[in-house]
């Protein structure tokens, strides 16, 4: 699960980039990875997908412990 948390941190940065650049291919890649992260486990699914990605990264990481 910690590997998934690392991905989540990485793509929080990507999300910030997409907000400022609005580059379509980057946004699609981000959405694809967000979907992958949400599939990491059955119990993680609802928590992951219900979170807004502009939430505190520490709030997101709390689901990984």
Curated annotation (Swiss-Prot):
Keywords: Signal. Residues 1-16 form the signal peptide. The keyword Signal applies. Partially overlaps TIM9. This is Putative uncharacterized protein YEL020C-B. It comes from Saccharomyces cerevisiae (strain ATCC 204508 / S288c) (Baker's yeast). The lineage of its organism: Eukaryota, Fungi, Dikarya, Ascomycota, Saccharomycotina.
């Amino acid at each position: 699960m910690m590997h998934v948390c690392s991905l989540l941190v990485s793509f929080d940065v990507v999300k910030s980039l997409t907000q400022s650049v609005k580059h379509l291919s980057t946004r699609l890649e981000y959405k694809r990875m967000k979907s992958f992260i949400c599939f990491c486990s059955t119990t993680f699914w609802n928590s992951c997908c219900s979170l807004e990605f502009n939430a505190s990264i520490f709030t997101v990481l709390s689901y990984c412990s």
